[in-house]
Amino acid sequence: MMIKRSITTNMKALRLIQPHLLKTGSLRTDLLCTISSFFSSCERDFSSISNGNVCFRERLRSGIVDIKKDDAIALFQEMIRSRPLPSLVDFSRFFSAIARTKQFNLVLDFCKQLELNGIAHNIYTLNIMINCFCRCCKTCFAYSVLGKVMKLGYEPDTTTFNTLIKGLFLEGKVSEAVVLVDRMVENGCQPDVVTYNSIVNGICRSGDTSLALDLLRKMEERNVKADVFTYSTIIDSLCRDGCIDAAISLFKEMETKGIKSSVVTYNSLVRGLCKAGKWNDGALLLKDMVSREIVPNVITFNVLLDVFVKEGKLQEANELYKEMITRGISPNIITYNTLMDGYCMQNRLSEANNMLDLMVRNKCSPDIVTFTSLIKGYCMVKRVDDGMKVFRNISKRGLVANAVTYSILVQGFCQSGKIKLAEELFQEMVSHGVLPDVMTYGILLDGLCDNGKLEKALEIFEDLQKSKMDLGIVMYTTIIEGMCKGGKVEDAWNLFCSLPCKGVKPNVMTYTVMISGLCKKGSLSEANILLRKMEEDGNAPNDCTYNTLIRAHLRDGDLTASAKLIEEMKSCGFSADASSIKMVIDMLLSGELDKSFLDMLS
């Protein structure tokens, strides 16, 4: 009745202003738009009574999954136009559904429109806003909504705080998240296990396992019972830190408290034990897992396969793979990639290709890691052309080569002496928008130096120094070695001496390379001084360092210095390498040394 009265009034008003609107052409257009809009609104007013509420409520009841932006906007407009207005429960349900599709900014726009239409928020819609701001990494705005929550007289609940904590971790604000938990307690809002699990997970991801353990003890003090997720997260973090004993201790504590372990807990422990070389303990734990009727999953087997492959135990890996199939567990891309990498590392390329065929037959699509492993395998046996054929087929499968793929092939060409092809591939990499990293540049510079293109290497190195790329000691060592081999020992020495000013600390390899350069130049006294400086700087010489100096002194005819260095080398647990032994034998045969020197060397 009210709507009809409103329409009658509006019609009278329209008749009164009609003569004025028709005076100009532009206003005639406005009139047509106005009339059209007017009757559309009338139609909507009537339709909303009969169909509107039924329509959107039916949509909400049936569930909104993967709704597109335009459809969401249309549905929201329908809700806003409906009379009577939908309840805040309906709006909350709608906003939550849109948020689940990760259209967070759209939800925030809807919330703003809700306010503009004079519809007040409740704690549920405000919590949804906080969640959306947090998921967009805008916790500062989320805090402003929290202020609104309090201003409206609502009490922030654990959902509010849990959401804020997750948002802080998304932005890497670990300390702020921990402080927020304490603030919750101070404000009389008791954090629940979900709150603590969010904090523990975030802290462990940031690498601060000790802080996670402290938080576990705080949970006990505050009478919040930790669950399997809490313990499993910390156990996994301890295993990744190499603290296996502490992880086992926490595992036993968990069992004592009656918290049943999950397959995730066992997976972490098995991985940790195997990586620490405790094979028997890992096997026993696996048996314990099965005896407790906790079924190993594909991750369990992948963990064990990875360890076997990295240890070079490919036979054991194959047996484990067969066991996996027997148990009815389907291999995934990680399983196949791990085994393929193992075959390639042992130059068993035929078996690697068979595994590739098998994964395709089993409807498991190879990824870039799969083909990169195969390319690496070909390059390792100097079959870089075959590796290149695999590389050219990658794009046909809809895959894009990454920096690792290109780097492996560039290295393959460099090691095969095909430096021109290496340079061409490097240029192709850049032209295809794949940014070379430090590893790629290091490989290229090393290849250029080894293939007599020092000047080209220095040109690239100079450009890199001007860039913002963190070159690292490996890159500098490569160039210093290239300079020394190319007869630019003075330049190498100047670069070596400038390293501290660049904030780069020389390592054992850097010192050894520089000592070798000084020896080739005949500057043995400087090489000896650098040996002692190396020790003072906390870099203990290795077998390569000693053998380099021993051979230099032998060439110089200083047998006394050579003998002293041999004794020092042996006392450090090192022995002569093949080059040193050959030199001594040659000098022995030519009469420059007696047999006692060879005895001392062995």
UniProtKB/Swiss-Prot annotation:
InterPro entries for this protein: Pentatricopeptide_rpt, PPR-containing_protein, TPR-like_helical_dom_sf
Protein name, UniProt field: Putative pentatricopeptide repeat-containing protein At1g12700, mitochondrial
GO annotation terms (biological process): mitochondrial mRNA 5'-end processing; mitochondrial mRNA modification
Renumbered ranges of PPR repeats: 87-121, 122-156, 157-191, 192-226, 227-261, 262-296, 297-331, 332-366, 367-401, 402-436, 437-471, 472-506, 507-541, 542-576
Transit peptide, residues from-to: 1-95
GO cellular component, one term: mitochondrion
Keywords: Mitochondrion, Repeat, Transit peptide
Cellular localisation: Mitochondrion
Gene source species: Arabidopsis thaliana (Mouse-ear cress)
Entry's family note: Belongs to the PPR family. P subfamily.
Species lineage: Eukaryota, Viridiplantae, Streptophyta, Embryophyta, Tracheophyta
